[in-house]
Design a protein with these regions (language model features):
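Membrane-embedded alpha-helical segments of integral membrane proteins
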Residues: 2-35
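Hydrophobic alpha-helical segments of integral membrane proteins
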Residues: 6-14, 62, 66-70, 243-250
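Lipid-exposed faces of alpha-helical membrane segments in multi-pass integral membrane proteins
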Residues: 10, 23-30, 46-56, 243, ...
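Structural signal for membrane-spanning alpha-helices in multi-pass inner-membrane proteins
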Residues: 32-35, 54, 58, 252
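Membrane-interface helix-boundary motifs at transmembrane edges
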Residues: 35-44
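Transmembrane helix-loop junctions in multipass membrane proteins, especially transporters and channels
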Residues: 40, 69-76, 256-264
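A structural signal for short, hydrophobic/glycine-enriched beta-strand patches
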Residues: 51, 56-236
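Extracytoplasmic/luminal low-complexity segments enriched in Pro/Gly and acidic/polar residues
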Residues: 221-222, 226, 230, 235-267
């Protein structure tokens, strides 16, 4: 357990340092500093190159090129089994700090995770419901995603008492292992996994390694079948999101937490 915590802390710090938006900010600061030294020529070249990269990523559909293979890996099920034993939703969409400050449920991207979970819960009234996810913050372990989830369940007509909460996982690998320990599902059961489409390959790979052959139900799609050219600085964040997901697939395969690099539908 201690090694899991160390891995989590190291991965959080490492990503904060190498994330594309961090590197771009570092290049801007470095180039601005060089402008005031005898290396001002190099500074002009560097700042021009950095602005060019920012413009390129903000205009061209780099984020779609990176995210779309992830989102297309698992199709939305055309139909689900008549009997669904349980439904799992992974935390990650909740804006826990704003929820705590304002008293209303607040979300980052990905609120579809919870709205789809509630919808499926109404369709399958006998299914076991599981919300999986503790605080993924290095600085705030007091407020948890479940606080936001309970509020939205209440507002959506789903009794929070019907939902089981796994509150201690800090990343997707722990979502899988701790949820499995909590539920102890049998191999013949049908469990539906709800998470963002770009996050589904990594999630399914980790759940399979834990011994849980879930039915993927991807939501929160970020891409379309076509590409458009427009200037949008938010594209940098989506590009970063895609890079993070591919790095996660590489790292989890390298550490043996998944059985294949790019988990996909089973034949």
């Amino acid at each position: 357990v201690q090694m899991e915590s160390v891995f989590w802390v190291v991965s959080k710090i490492a990503w904060a340092l190498i994330a594309p938006e961090t590197l771009l900010l570092f290049l801007l600061i470095l180039s601005a500093g060089l402008l005031w030294t005898r290396y001002n020529k190099q500074g002009r070249v560097l700042i021009s190159s950095t602005v060019f990269i920012i413009t390129l990523v903000s205009v061209l559909p780099f984020s779609s090129w990176i995210l779309r293979p992830l989102e297309d890996r698992f199709p939305i099920p055309k139909e689900l089994p008549n009997r669904v034993d349980g439904i799992i939703v992974l935390a990650g969409a909740e804006n826990i700090s704003v929820t705590a400050a304002r008293g209303q449920p607040s979300f980052h991207d990905g609120a579809e995770r919870l709205t789809t979970f509630v919808w499926l819960a109404h369709i399958y009234p006998d299914a076991v419901l599981l919300f999986s996810g503790g605080s993924g913050s290095l600085t705030d372990q007091k407020h948890r995603p479940a606080d936001t989830a309970r509020k939205i369940f209440n507002q959506s007509g789903l009794d929070p008492e019907r939902v089981r909460f796994e509150l201690n996982s800090k990343n997707t690998a722990e979502n899988a292992s701790k949820s499995y320990e909590l539920i102890q599902p049998s191999p013949d059961q049908h469990w539906v996994l709800v998470t963002s489409a770009f996050h589904m390959p990594r999630s399914v790979g980790l759940f399979r390694k834990a011994g849980w052959n879930v039915i993927p139900y991807p939501v929160d799609f970020q891409t379309t079948k076509s590409f458009s050219l427009k200037f949008d600085l938010r594209e940098i964040g989506r590009f970063s999101q895609g890079i993070r997901e591919w790095l996660g697939l590489i790292v989890y395969r390298a550490t043996g937490d998944t059985l294949t690099f790019f988990p996909g539908p089973k034949e």
